[in-house]
Design a protein with these regions (language model features):
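Conserved catalytic and cofactor-binding micro-motifs
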Residues: 1-2, 212
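Beta-strand->loop->alpha-helix junctions that form or flank phosphate-binding loops
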Residues: 6-9, 45-52, 90-93, 182-204, ...
Length: 320
């Protein structure tokens, strides 16, 4: 495409020929490139604003939550692609099943992983939304859980009235946020208190087989190759969304049965001398616990190494 790539951030890459500078939420105002762009009068927009403007031209599906966003977004994109709908998608992780983390599709659907940091997800205009869970995260920006819940409430109210919001039914914080939704709401969980619920069946070897019920009526039976009960929950959200979109059951079943996950989301790096090495992006207490729990059925001994995901987030979560 002719794009020029540079790793320098000293302002030298900016020129008056630049039409627009797109910055992520993590770029601070003292960044040399950003300072130079502003000095030259170049238009500066946030990444989430660009994402929002692109979504306006299609039927938007936005997946939010403290954790599970990437996998759920990947599942939905994989299902839609399997169904021949050729969606546009932007996901926060590489997904081998669908050729990467982004794709400009010819279909009218746009799947986006909706990040809550800096309230970025409020720049999106989705017809369909998902909230997987709400927990303490990005405290360097939000300061407390109440402000996080409020932001998710704003997200819930942004879903178009003729759309659908799919939410985890066993999260008290989600229950507060979802009260501000103007659209239809469907819940999911692993018990029959929800609109969509899954019943995990014994299989072993990390494979998950589960029955799905919709409003107490049997819907179908599904298989997941990726381990972890949390991934059954992610799959339930994906099933609810894709059913609303109009995808047939067979396409959903085929896509989920072949789904291998996103890179660094419980990714098996290799096996040698009876040792399986797994790479997982887990970077807060709940995510770490879920990753370790997913390992336990696979081996009698689990050894974990933790790499802090930035100084600020780790400092706020050190007591946990």
């Amino acid at each position: 495409m002719g794009a020029k790539i540079t790793t320098k951030q000293d302002g030298s890459f900016m020129s008056l020929e630049t039409d627009m500078v797109v910055v992520s939420a993590s770029i601070s105002e003292d960044n040399p490139d950003l300072k130079t762009a502003r000095k030259l009068g170049i238009k500066v927009v946030k990444y989430s604003q660009i994402l929002g403007s692109l979504m306006k031209e299609k039927r938007g599906i936005a997946i939010s939550g403290t954790h599970g966003k990437t996998t759920t977004s990947a599942m939905i994109s994989t299902i839609l692609k399997t169904a021949g709908l050729d969606p546009t998608f932007v996901i926060g992780g590489e997904v081998p099943d669908i050729g990467g983390n982004a794709h400009l599709g010819k279909g009218n659907l746009f799947v986006a992983e909706a990040c809550e940091y800096d309230r970025s997800f409020l720049n999106l205009t989705p017809q369909v939304g998902v909230i997987t869970n709400i927990e303490e995260d990005h405290l360097d920006y939000y300061e407390n859980i109440e402000k996080i819940i409020n932001a998710f409430g704003d997200f819930a109210s942004s879903i178009s009235k003729d759309g659908l919001l799919v939410v985890n039914n066993h999260d008290d914080n989600v229950a507060v946020a979802v009260q501000r939704a103007y659209c239809k709401v469907e819940t999911y969980s692993l018990d029959n208190s929800s609109d969509w619920y899954g019943e995990v069946l014994p299989v072993g070897s990390g494979i998950k087989r589960f029955r799905v019920f919709k409003k107490d009526k049997f819907f179908d039976e599904f298989i997941l190759k990726i381990p972890g009960t949390h991934n059954v929950l992610n799959a339930l959200a994906a099933i609810a969304v894709c059913t609303f979109i109009g995808v047939d059951k067979d396409s959903i079943k085929t896509a989920l049965a072949s789904f291998l996950g996103a890179n660094r989301r419980f990714q098996i790096v290799g096996v040698r001398s009876g040792i399986t090495v797994i790479d997982d992006y887990a970077h807060n207490p709940v995510k770490c616990a879920a990753a370790i729990a997913s390992c336990q059925p696979l081996a009698s001994k689990v050894v974990a190494w933790f790499q802090p995901h930035g100084y600020g987030p780790t400092r706020f979560l050190r007591a946990d």
